[in-house]
Curated annotation (Swiss-Prot):
Belongs to the GrpE family. It comes from Trichormus variabilis (strain ATCC 29413 / PCC 7937) (Anabaena variabilis). The gene is grpE. One of its GO terms (cellular component) is cytoplasm. This is Protein GrpE. It is found in: Cytoplasm. Homodimer. GO terms for molecular function: adenyl-nucleotide exchange factor activity; protein homodimerization activity; protein-folding chaperone binding; unfolded protein binding. Gene3D superfamilies: 3.90.20.20, Head domain of nucleotide exchange factor GrpE. Residues 238-248 have a biased composition (Polar residues). GO terms for biological process: protein folding.
Length: 248
């Protein structure tokens, strides 16, 4: 019982002290509160410049000056300019190499295409040259053989039909015959195998085609064998020489 009374008294004392503190706080005047707030505002206003000055000092200590920054920018710009010039030089070199390679490839393509065309033409030419003697034999047979009976005419028409098919096939391949009669002799087209003295045609005129020549496209496939006009020999000097001994 004694202990419980002590605890009750102690609790009452604490409550009394709390009440006194509250009354002291409530008894403070509004003017005093206003003064305290003004003092806090002044303190904060004074502290702000101090912080700004401190920040500025820190920036100057940890950063670079304007001159150093400008020098660094100038150096970086110079380095970038040098890199750009170097890249431009490399680009020009690569472009030149590309153009050279492209030109070489185009020349190679044209050369191989021309070689292929020449090879194809040579194969075609050799094949057609093997067929031309057959055409010559057909033409000789047509000019020399004169069918007399109906059976001979039938045979003549049959092989002439084969001849016509062969000639048509050669035309489709680009083969065309020469027509040299009456033209001036051209060693690039004709081969002179005979000369006939005559005063009816100028010297060097082709009088007759003995073996027909052919073109393959615009090229000579086979030269034409021809007879060429020659100047007629004058017999007057020989007659005078023969009459001179008789006079003596």
């Amino acid at each position: 019982m004694i202990d419980e009374n002590k605890q009750v008294n102690h609790t009452s004392q604490q409550l009394g002290e709390s009440t006194e503190v509250k009354q002291a706080i409530m008894s403070e005047s509004p003017a005093q509160i206003n003064n305290n707030e003004s003092t806090n505002e002044v303190t904060e206003s004074v502290a702000i410049p101090t912080n700004v000055v401190g920040d500025t000092t820190a920036t100057e200590d940890n950063g670079f000056t304007a001159t150093q920054i400008q020098e660094a920018n100038t150096a970086a710009l110079a380095e970038l300019t040098q890199q750009i010039n170097s890249l431009k030089t490399q680009l020009d070199e690569r472009s030149t190499q590309y153009m050279r390679i492209a030109a070489d490839f185009e020349n190679y393509r044209k050369r191989t295409q021309k070689e292929k065309e020449e090879l194809d033409l040579q194969v075609k030419r050799n094949t057609i040259l093997e067929l031309l003697p057959i055409v010559d034999n057909f033409e000789r047979a047509r000019s020399h053989l004169k069918p007399q009976t109906e059976s001979e005419m039938t045979i003549h028409k049959s092989y002439q039909g084969v001849y016509k098919q062969l000639v048509d096939s050669l035309k489709r391949l680009g083969v065309s015959p020469m027509r040299p009669e009456g033209q001036e002799f051209d060693p690039n087209l004709h081969e002179a195998v005979m000369r006939e003295p005559t005063d009816e045609h100028p010297e060097g005129t082709v009088l007759e085609e003995l073996v027909r020549g052919y073109y393959l496209g615009d090229r000579v496939l086979r030269h034409s064998m021809v007879k060429v006009a020659a100047p007629k020999e004058d017999t007057l000097p020989a007659q005078e020489n023969q009459s001179s001994p008789a006079d003596s």
